[in-house]
Amino acid sequence: MERTFLMIKPDAVQRNLIGEIISRIEKKGLKLVGGKFMQVPMELAEKHYSEHEGKPFYDKLISFITSAPVFAMVVEGENAVAVSRKIIGSTNPSEAAPGTIRGDYGLNLGRNIIHGSDSTESAQREVKLWFTSSEIADYKEPREDWLYE
């Protein structure tokens, strides 16, 4: 099974959307295998968003992601990266389809509720950056027999 990294951002945490977001992810068949509620240290934020360093929005992004707690998680399932990206919706909430997390809850590009790895390579890098192997559970849910052929 494929794993991916998701992070419920400060705007969603402050709006009490953690449970709703996790529920949507689980209802789609993805399994939560790691999760932690945390204040993001500056160093971790800079490593996570290193690809954006030097861009006009970088400082604001780092400031935002370290401003309040986030809920970081690892989810697992068949095509987890693609499935989670579809549930999340377009990066810009004004372009996200209704029924997606960002389409329903996102306010603008800077307050877009959730981060999701954009590729299997990014997912592997981000999972390793945010979680140790001991923080990720390896288990089987009874529903898996009903979800996958």
Swiss-Prot record:
<comment type="function">
    <text>Major role in the synthesis of nucleoside triphosphates other than ATP. The ATP gamma phosphate is transferred to the NDP beta phosphate via a ping-pong mechanism, using a phosphorylated active-site intermediate.</text>
</comment>
<comment type="similarity">
    <text>Belongs to the NDK family.</text>
</comment>
<feature type="active site" description="Pros-phosphohistidine intermediate">
    <location>
        <position position="115"/>
    </location>
</feature>
<dbReference type="InterPro" id="IPR034907">
    <property type="entry name" value="NDK-like_dom"/>
</dbReference>
<feature type="binding site">
    <location>
        <position position="91"/>
    </location>
    <ligand>
        <name>ATP</name>
    </ligand>
</feature>
<keyword id="KW-0597">Phosphoprotein</keyword>
<comment type="subunit">
    <text>Homotetramer.</text>
</comment>
<feature type="binding site">
    <location>
        <position position="57"/>
    </location>
    <ligand>
        <name>ATP</name>
    </ligand>
</feature>
<dbReference type="Pfam" id="PF00334">
    <property type="entry name" value="NDK"/>
</dbReference>
<keyword id="KW-0067">ATP-binding</keyword>
<feature type="binding site">
    <location>
        <position position="112"/>
    </location>
    <ligand>
        <name>ATP</name>
    </ligand>
</feature>
<dbReference type="InterPro" id="IPR001564">
    <property type="entry name" value="Nucleoside_diP_kinase"/>
</dbReference>
<keyword id="KW-0479">Metal-binding</keyword>
<dbReference type="GO" id="GO:0046872">
    <property type="term" value="F:metal ion binding"/>
</dbReference>
<feature type="binding site">
    <location>
        <position position="85"/>
    </location>
    <ligand>
        <name>ATP</name>
    </ligand>
</feature>
<keyword id="KW-0547">Nucleotide-binding</keyword>
<keyword id="KW-0546">Nucleotide metabolism</keyword>
<dbReference type="GO" id="GO:0006241">
    <property type="term" value="P:CTP biosynthetic process"/>
</dbReference>
<dbReference type="GO" id="GO:0006228">
    <property type="term" value="P:UTP biosynthetic process"/>
</dbReference>
<keyword id="KW-0808">Transferase</keyword>
<keyword id="KW-0418">Kinase</keyword>
<feature type="binding site">
    <location>
        <position position="102"/>
    </location>
    <ligand>
        <name>ATP</name>
    </ligand>
</feature>
<protein>
    <recommendedName>
        <fullName>Nucleoside diphosphate kinase</fullName>
        <ecNumber>2.7.4.6</ecNumber>
    </recommendedName>
</protein>
<feature type="binding site">
    <location>
        <position position="9"/>
    </location>
    <ligand>
        <name>ATP</name>
    </ligand>
</feature>
<keyword id="KW-0460">Magnesium</keyword>
<keyword id="KW-0963">Cytoplasm</keyword>
<dbReference type="GO" id="GO:0005737">
    <property type="term" value="C:cytoplasm"/>
</dbReference>
<dbReference type="GO" id="GO:0004550">
    <property type="term" value="F:nucleoside diphosphate kinase activity"/>
</dbReference>
<dbReference type="GO" id="GO:0005524">
    <property type="term" value="F:ATP binding"/>
</dbReference>
<dbReference type="GO" id="GO:0006183">
    <property type="term" value="P:GTP biosynthetic process"/>
</dbReference>
<dbReference type="InterPro" id="IPR036850">
    <property type="entry name" value="NDK-like_dom_sf"/>
</dbReference>
